[in-house]
Amino acid sequence: MPNNRREAARITLMTHHGLSDRVVELLSSLNLPAVLAENARCVRQNVKAGYWGFSSLRMGFSDAASEIYRLTVKRESAVPLLCRLIEGLELRTPGRGAIYAQNVEEISQRDLPDIELEQVKSDWLLSDLALITGIQTKSGGGENLYKVALKLGAGVPVVGIGIGTGIRDRLGLLRITISPEKELVHLMVPGHDANGLQRLLIEEGHVDRPGGGFLYQTPIQAGMVDPLLRIGRQEHAASIEQIIAAIDDLKKSTAWRKRFFGVEDISDNASVANFTHREISFFCYEGQSDNLVEAAMQAGAAGATVSRLRTLYLQGADAGKSISC
């Protein structure tokens, strides 16, 4: 069966682990054949009362087990599917997760699923978004990117785990000094602030230093962010995150909370400069990634990061079966 190259939309859903059964049930009801799932963690700031009863608050970090689900559909089905998943999983409630769609080119032997969904009102979907992805060694000298992102109020980071290959494999004995484990930080941010936040993340996270990792941004077609940056003690009737989410809903945009002006504005020239590369993702069965990585290195790629996912089959005789990939 030949490989087909076509335009598609990749849907990425990041939810709390407790919603896993509900996600699978909802996707099955939409007649989707399968979905890729990845274990991850969602990091938020944890606000606690000060020591000895003082009024000052202490700030820490709290991890919550999360799942990242990925599937590709026809581009015309992306927005209706986003709306259906947001409604079915109640993602407009802060803390339940985030979702977004990106336009991609896909090469696969499998046909894109036919989804029959009614066209729904999508005014509350945000379209002025960008995805910042950072890949950093777990034992790196710089501060963790997710901590920097939370301190900057950039958004709620979702962190996955991967194994670095490519450059490290060429270092010989020196590679024992570099941990192969990588943290993959996924961060949805307003598109108009993406340049400024990317610059701050690079500086504060020491990404521009040798061994500091790398960071890049990709455009988002539409999505819904999770505004719950902080959990724990709350001193007012509504948190600042709830207020921001309400204003986003009223304004139908995040442009009102622009943080960087002047040199950080995204002009036509800046937009072209930001997207000079392409992200290439291979999804294969476990044990086949080495050949793909080797081919990528021979074609000129500087490195690759391998993550472990699983394919969840949702229909037919294989429904409920999970295969590592």
Model-predicted segments: where are they?
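Positively charged, small/polar-rich N-terminal and surface patches that mediate targeting and assembly
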Residues: 1-325
